[in-house]
Amino acid sequence: MKHDSTIVRLDSIDAYNKLYGLETKHPLVTVIDLTEATKIVNHVRMDYDVYALFLKNGANCTLKYGRQPYDYQEGTVVSFSPGQLIGVDTDVDEIAPDVIGIMFHPDLLHRTPLASKIKDYSFFDYSQREALHQSADERRIFNQCLERIKEEIAHPVDKHTAEIVSSQIQVLLDYVTRFYERQFITRGKVKSDILSRFESSLKKYFESDRTKEGLPTVNYFAEEAHLTAGYFGDMIKKETGVTAQEIISRHIVDRAKRRLSESADDISIVAYELGFQHPQHFSRMFKRITGISPTQFREKHSSGR
C-alpha cells in the first residue's frame, strides 16, 4: 500500500529527538538508541541539516535516498550528511526499531581539527547499495565508540566538551573508513568487475564521438557503474593505488602520445580531438604526467627515428 510521506526538516538534534520522543542531553550531538523511542515514525522523509551514522540491528526498516532503497540489512551502517533527503518506510508501524547511532550538528565541529577533515570522509556521500556491512567484531568497536561519546555528553558541558566529543567522533569515523576498506577487499570480484568495466568504458569513450562533448569525468563512469562518485573513486583507488581521475588522465596522455607520434597535426588539434576545450590545459596535464611538454615529446620522438 502506498503512503504519502511527510517531509521533516532535521535542522537540530532536538528536532530528531522530539520526532522519536527521545531526550536531548546536548544541543549539538546525540547518541541514538531507537529501542528507547516513545513515538512511531513511519512514512516520512527527513531533510538532513546534520551528520548521522546508524547501525541497524533489527530487520524491519527500509530507508530510501530519492526513490532508491538503501542497502540497509541487519548489521549494516548507513551515513547521512547535510543536504540529503532520506525516506523512512516500514511494512508495519514499529515504535522502537533496533537501531543505534550518532547524530551531530556541523556547529559542534567549529574550531576543532575535525572541522577541516570532515569533508575527507567520503562515505557520507555514498548512496544506495553502498552501506557498510559490519562483522561482529566491527559492530563491537562501533558500539564501544558510541558508548565513549555517550559517557562524555552525559557530563555537564564545559570548555573541553566540544574538543573531546569531536575527537571521539573522529575516531569513530576513522574506524568506519577502515571497515569500508576491508569491505572493498572482501568484495574482490565485484571490485575487479567494476575496474574492468571502467577500463573498457574509458577506451570506448575515446573510440566514439563522445570526446566532442568534452573530457570524461569520474562521475560519468560512476553513473555507468550505478555507484556514487565517492564510493566508485574509493573502490578504484583501493584496487589500483591511484585515483580514478589519475587513471583517466594517464589514459588521455597515452592516447596523446600516439597521436603526437603518428601525425604532424598541430598540438591544439590533438587537444581538441581528445576533448579539451583549451589546449593549454592539455599541455599542462601532459607535462605533469610525462615531465615534458607535448612539443618536447614530439621533438624527442622525431629525433629518435
PLM region descriptions:
Residues 1-71:
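Generic protein-terminus/edge-of-domain signal
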Residues 67-81:
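Short acidic-glycine-tyrosine-enriched beta hairpin
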Residues 75, 232, 281-282, 286:
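Short hydrophobic/aromatic patch on the recognition helix
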Residues 91-155:
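A hydrophobic/aromatic-rich effector-binding and dimerization subdomain
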Residues 140-189, 193-200:
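An amphipathic alpha-helical interaction segment
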Residues 195-245, 263-272:
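DNA-binding recognition helix and immediately preceding turn/loop
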Residues 239-277, 299-305:
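Terminal helix-turn-helix DNA-binding modules in bacterial transcription factors
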Residues 283-305:
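…primarily DNA-binding HTH/wHTH and HhH modules…
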